[in-house]
A protein has these predicted regions:
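HhH-family (HhH-GPD) DNA N-glycosylase catalytic core used in base-excision repair
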Residues: 1-133
Length: 133
């Protein structure tokens, strides 16, 4: 049974989302068709996509953003957390604020890891204290 702390593979996820009762328990609401389309599309990806063989971050981002409901931030999150592109930097409100207020730039190889620290720093208030807020 899915939901016991495991992450289903794309094929399993597509099957689970096709089950109305199971999908209702997830409470995905309007996001369900987007997730279902993404899982179905992931099935068609070449295995190299998941192994990152000869696939650049830009190629992965472009392909992900072609999926309904997936924009730059979500694509960056998938690339960083799901596909292991440590250079992917998801930009949300907190990160955009940090960029604007500090003029910071991101490490070419580990920007995604750097982003996680900056996100926590700004969101948890340390950034506010440093900014005099």
């Amino acid at each position: 049974e899915a939901g016991g702390g495991c992450v289903p593979k794309p094929g399993e996820l597509a099957g689970l989302l096709a089950d109305e009762a199971f999908a209702a328990r997830l409470k995905l609401g309007y996001r369900r068709p987007y997730l279902e389309a993404l899982a179905t599309r992931a099935l068609a990806w070449h295995p190299a996509r998941l192994d990152r063989e000869d696939v650049s971050l830009e190629e992965s981002m472009t392909e992900l953003e072609e999926c309904p409901g997936v924009g730059p931030k979500v694509a960056s999150c998938i690339c960083l957390f799901g596909l292991g592109y440590l250079e992917a930097v998801p930009r949300d409100t907190w990160i955009k604020r940090a960029e604007r207020e500090t003029g910071m730039s991101w490490d070419e190889r580990y920007g995604g890891i750097q982003q996680q620290y900056v996100f926590a720093w700004y969101r948890e208030g340390a950034g506010r204290h440093e900014r005099g807020v």
